[in-house]
Amino acid sequence: MLSKGRSPRRKQVQTQRKAALVLSVTPMVPVGSVWLAMSSVLSAFMRELPGWFLFFGVFLPVTLLLLLLIAYFRIKLIEVNEELSQNCDRQHNPKDGSSLYQRMKWT
């Protein structure tokens, strides 16, 4: 029996949501049931979540953060490469005024 204002579809959706909640809470459930419960929860989540929020609130900030991290580590890598090349030049080129070079020059 349906009460006034309730359609069979609404009642079916509510029972599916309750079943998904029960399946997601129960610890010893077969894998197929977990997949069914998870898919219904995800579909309900995607129905309620606006697309613009998903794009501007999740996808865009994560993408910008990853690009920022890539740029930061690239800058640090370039700095380290420059320091290593300067140290390597100093070791192979003793004309920088080191005392060992000056001693060898005087003898």
Curated annotation (Swiss-Prot):
GO cellular component, one term: membrane
Compartments reported by the entry: Membrane
Organism for this UniProt entry: Homo sapiens (Human)
Keywords: Membrane, Transmembrane, Transmembrane helix
Intrachain S-S bonds: none
Taxonomic placement: Eukaryota, Metazoa, Chordata, Craniata, Vertebrata
Membrane topology category: Multi-pass membrane protein
Principal place of residence: membrane
Name of the protein in its database record: Small leucine-rich protein 1
Disordered: annotated span: 85-107
Transmembrane segments: 19-39, 53-73
